[in-house]
Curated annotation (Swiss-Prot):
It comes from Paenibacillus harenae. Disulfide bonds: none annotated. SUPFAM superfamilies: Metallo-hydrolase/oxidoreductase (SSF56281). Belongs to the nuclease anti-Pycsar protein Apyc1 family. Keywords: Hydrolase, Metal-binding, Zinc. Counteracts the endogenous Pycsar antiviral defense system. Phosphodiesterase that enables metal-dependent hydrolysis of host cyclic nucleotide Pycsar defense signals such as cCMP and cUMP. Gene3D superfamilies: Ribonuclease Z/Hydroxyacylglutathione hydrolase-like. This is Anti-Pycsar protein Apyc1. Homodimer. The keyword Nucleus does not apply. Coordinates 2 Zn(2+) ions. One protomer coordinates the metal ions and the opposing protomer provides the catalytic residues required for cCMP hydrolysis. SMART domains: Lactamase_B.
Length: 241
């Protein structure tokens, strides 16, 4: 299993594009989140939407779903395909009603299912996405009263998406066999809706060595050598996980 970050930036970062990723397993390509900058960033990588087999959404914020309108329109009108959308059952209605409906609706096309092959996922239940690729959606805290999910792939790779620091969860995952953690990281205090670097630095050395930092701000270069045993994910670089 390999991952390439299309972007590694925080919601307000201007240098690194939205924190979205391509996860590859046995010839299948899963897009993890589809933010505002995703269409352009994907193009700059020399890739196009038809090369994506499915998209998996973590929560409803523009840097994670803001590119879905263009994705849907391109696939429908340019490529005559309905892309597969893996999504928590709790996110289906808010994604359509609060984010996509205004831009995508053109009668008689007025449902999410008109644009995507919607595959609902129930949280905390392991689901096979492709042969050899399984995911478990873990409800995590990000914004109060707003559902948000992190992803556990094949019981060994944890992808936080956006979440507040949860030391207990990270220790439990590491003890349970997780080998690699890609975690969002807010560089400056306080970490209100994301884990801060200082919070992540409280993790044991053994867990830090498994942890890679993503979803960071434009000042990340100032933090080189200041991240303990954790490493910084580089955009567009391919990692085995």
């Amino acid at each position: 299993m390999h991952i390439r970050m299309v972007g590694t930036g925080s919601a307000f970062a201007k240098k690194f594009d939205n924190n979205n990723a391509l996860l590859e397993q046995d010839g299948c390509c899963l897009l993890i989140d589809c933010g505002i900058t995703l269409p352009k960033a994907l193009y700059q990588m020399g890739l196009a939407f038809p090369e994506i087999d499915a998209v998996l959404i973590s929560h409803i914020h523009a840097d994670h779903v803001g590119g879905l309108e263009e994705f849907a329109f391109q696939m429908m009108f340019k490529y005559n395909r309905k892309p597969v959308l893996f999504i928590a059952d709790t996110l289906i209605e808010p994604l359509w009603e609060h984010t996509l409906r205004g831009g995508l609706t053109q009668d008689p096309l007025n449902k999410l299912e008109h644009f995507f092959d919607v595959r609902p996922i129930i949280a905390n239940t392991e689901t096979e996405l492709f042969p050899g690729l399984r995911v478990k959606l873990l409800p995590t805290k990000h914004i109060p009263n707003k559902p948000s999910y992190s992803f556990l792939f094949n019981d060994r790779f944890f992808y936080s998406a956006d979440m507040r620091f949860d030391k207990e969860l990270l220790l439990r995952l590491a003890d349970g066999g997780v080998q690699t953690i890609f975690h969002d990281c807010q560089l400056e205090e306080p970490g209100v809706v994301h884990a801060s670097l200082n919070e992540l630095l409280t993790l044991p050395e053994s867990v830090q060595k498994k942890t890679w930092l993503m979803h960071y701000g434009d000042t990340i270069d100032q933090y080189q050598g200041r991240t303990g045993h954790m490493r910084i994910v580089e955009p567009q670089r391919r990692y085995e996980v």
